[in-house]
């Protein structure tokens, strides 16, 4: 089953739109609009590309035949995959070739998936290590790029393969990383951490429910955290599960996220109508989000935006 999976990036990008659209809070001594907008865009791209790596890994691991002697596999439009079925651990090497088949970005670099010999990805608790080497993603609209290096672990908590999802109740995956290096277009490097859980179910199509699994003090549901390109700490938390449905064109149908910095907190609630009330799938029409943010002086503002 080949699926287009919308990531948390749509949520973060919407928060970025909110900050660029709103007026400066003149009662605060510092205007954080530019920094928060840039950070939201950075986080949205990182979230999208780390999710894309996990999606590509799932595509490559989708059938056990990939470890039965085929030396070269093509299931990703801008990459080739080479399988090593002899070494321990077994590996699948994904090499991105920079082809513009995705329409909005190009990718170069290598991601190596490794799994211990004898371990089957379909089994409960099976884990693969995703080693990311110079994965450079260039956005075609403005030629800006990010480069990702480091490793993450994807665990098939429940067992099962996504190609068999219609016959299964659910499949649960987690993606974690203790530190992935992100290089921004200004050559600034930062280390970000990841802690996400994705639950795949089938209800008139694929349903993906994403949550954050990291806790820091009293803050729970953290999906990503670290220091932004300006050197300031941030967290991106999922306050209410982000739900994406295939029968709604793989769009976010509900959920709430929060982006936090010491000086600013912003949140966005999804799956609303134009009045801000939760709604069912609007078909080809727009969903709306309600964005709320608190300035340094403690005042609260909100806006309803389409997505």
Region locations from a protein language model:
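Low-complexity, intrinsically disordered segments exposed to solvent
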Residues: 23-307
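Bacterial N-terminal signal peptides that target proteins for export
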Residues: 1-9
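C-terminal motif of bacterial Sec signal peptides marking the signal peptidase cleavage site
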Residues: 18-21
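Bacterial N-terminal signal peptides
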Residues: 9-16
């Amino acid at each position: 089953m080949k699926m287009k999976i919308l990531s948390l990036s749509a949520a973060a990008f919407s928060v970025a739109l909110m900050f660029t659209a709103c007026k400066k809070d003149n009662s605060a001594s510092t205007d954080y609009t530019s920094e928060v907008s840039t950070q939201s865009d950075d986080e949205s791209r990182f979230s999208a590309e780390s999710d894309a790596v996990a999606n590509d890994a799932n595509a490559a691991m989708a059938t056990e035949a990939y470890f039965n002697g085929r030396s070269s596999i093509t299931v990703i439009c801008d990459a080739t995959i080479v399988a090593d079925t002899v070494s321990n651990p077994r590996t699948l090497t994904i090499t991105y070739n920079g082809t513009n088949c995705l329409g909005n970005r190009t990718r170069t670099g290598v991601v190596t998936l490794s799994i211990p010999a004898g371990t089957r990805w379909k089994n409960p608790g099976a884990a693969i290590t995703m080693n990311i080497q110079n994965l450079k993603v260039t956005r075609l609209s403005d030629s800006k790029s990010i480069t990702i290096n480091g490793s993450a672990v994807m665990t098939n908590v429940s067992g099962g393969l996504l190609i068999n999802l219609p016959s299964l109740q659910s499949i649960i995956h987690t993606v974690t990383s203790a530190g992935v290096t992100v290089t921004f277009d200004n050559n600034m490097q930062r280390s970000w951490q990841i802690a996400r859980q994705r639950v795949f179910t089938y209800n008139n199509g694929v349903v993906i429910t994403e949550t954050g699994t990291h806790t820091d003090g009293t803050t729970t549901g953290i999906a990503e955290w670290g220091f932004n390109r300006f050197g300031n700490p941030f967290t991106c938390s999922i306050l209410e599960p982000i739900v994406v449905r295939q029968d709604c064109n793989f769009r976010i149908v509900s959920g709430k996220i929060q982006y936090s910095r010491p000086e600013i907190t912003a949140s966005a609630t999804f799956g609303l109508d134009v009045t801000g009330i939760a709604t069912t799938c609007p078909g080809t029409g727009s969903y709306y989000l309600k964005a709320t943010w608190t300035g340094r002086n403690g005042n609260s503002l909100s806006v309803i935006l389409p997505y």
